[in-house]
C-alpha cells in the first residue's frame, strides 16, 4: 500500500518496484490486470471496476492480507512508472522465504519476508537475471 508507493517514488531512475501478495489474497494483482493501461485519473473514478474485495483472504503472511489494497492506485502508478509488476506467490514460497530469512539473523515475520518469496522460482513475476541487483525490505517482526 502506502509503504510500497513511498518506497517506489524514492527509488532512483533505473530501479523498478515489484509488489508481492499471496495466492490467498492478491487484490492488487487482480486490479493491475483489470486496469490494464487505464489512465491513472480514471482508476479513482472507476475504483469498483478494478479493486474489488477478495473473498476469504488467508495466508501465513497475514500482515499483508486485506480484502482490498486501499492505497492501490499509488502502487499501480509507481509500478507503471518504474517498469515493475505485482508478483503473486504460493504459500509454499512464503514458508520457504521465511525459513531463508530467519537464517539472516533478522527476527522477521512471514509477512516481513514476503518480498523474498517474490524472488523464489515459484513466483509469478519477472525472474532476476544473473548479476542483477535487488533490494528486499524485511518489514515485519516475528512476535510468536
Question: Which residues does each predicted region cover?
Answer:
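Residues that form or flank phosphate/diphosphate-binding pockets in enzymes
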Residues: 1, 110
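Buried hydrophobic packing segments
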Residues: 2-6, 28, 115-122
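Phosphate-binding loop/pocket of nucleotide- and phosphate-handling active sites
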Residues: 36-44, 48-61, 78, 113-144
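Active-site/ligand-binding loops adjacent to catalytic centers
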Residues: 8-108
Amino acid at each position: 500500500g502506502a509503504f510500497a508507493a513511498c518506497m517506489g517514488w524514492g527509488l532512483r531512475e533505473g530501479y523498478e518496484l515489484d509488489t508481492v501478495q499471496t495466492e490467498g489474497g492478491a487484490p492488487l494483482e487482480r486490479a493491475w490486470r483489470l486496469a490494464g493501461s487505464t489512465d491513472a485519473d480514471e482508476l479513482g473514478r472507476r475504483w469498483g471496476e478494478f479493486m474489488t474485495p477478495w473473498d476469504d483472504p488467508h495466508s501465513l503472511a497475514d500482515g499483508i492480507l486485506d480484502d482490498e489494497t486501499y492505497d492501490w492506485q499509488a502502487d499501480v502508478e509507481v509500478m507503471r512508472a518504474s517498469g515493475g509488476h505485482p508478483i503473486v506467490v504460493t504459500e509454499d514460497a512464503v514458508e520457504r522465504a521465511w525459513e531463508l530469512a530467519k537464517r539472516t539473523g533478522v527476527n522477521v515475520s512471514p509477512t516481513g519476508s514476503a518480498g523474498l518469496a517474490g524472488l523464489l522460482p515459484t513466483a509469478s513475476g519477472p525472474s532476476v537475471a544473473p548479476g542483477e541487483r535487488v533490494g528486499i525490505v524485511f518489514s515485519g517482526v516475528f512476535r510468536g
